[in-house]
Amino acid sequence: MMGDLLTGAGVPNAVIDLDWLRRSWPSPAGDRFNVTMALRNLRSVAGNYREAGAVRIVLAGVIETRIERDRHQDALGVPLAMCRLRVDLPLVRARLAQRHEREGEVLQWHLARSGELDTILEAAAIEDFTVDATDLSISSIAKTVLSTVGWQGLFPSS
């Protein structure tokens, strides 16, 4: 949605899903979520997008620590503005139950991880701002994030 809004406003952009940049197996010992691979790929992919003319790059994913944040900014090659999308945990878990209703083990992992991640992100507090997305539409979330980052004026008021 953020990429669509930027494109609709005529802003050259790229959207990068960090999960796909880390998706390989096995992860090295001590790197549970293969962050090192994600960073290597981010450096290349972001550089390619910038060379192709992207002036806004949106990253979608989880960054858990200040060190990881700094490493992502370094790999991105431009200053990073970080938003935490906050959704009430019971709603997160209800959505996970729908998404993984026929995947028992996968569902249990995601349910446990959602609580773990909520605690980690709350304690780390490495975001520049937080958007409570519990009751917002996807479009409203995207517009709020883009406006808060300072890219206001790109979209007509709605």
Identify the role of each PLM range.
Residues 1-7, 25, 29-30, 52, ...:
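A structural preference for long, well-packed, hydrophobic secondary-structure segments
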Residues 31-35, 75-77, 99-103:
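Short, hinge-like loop/turn segments at secondary-structure boundaries
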Residues 76-97, 131:
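Conserved phosphate-donor/acceptor-positioning beta-strand/loop module used by diverse small-molecule
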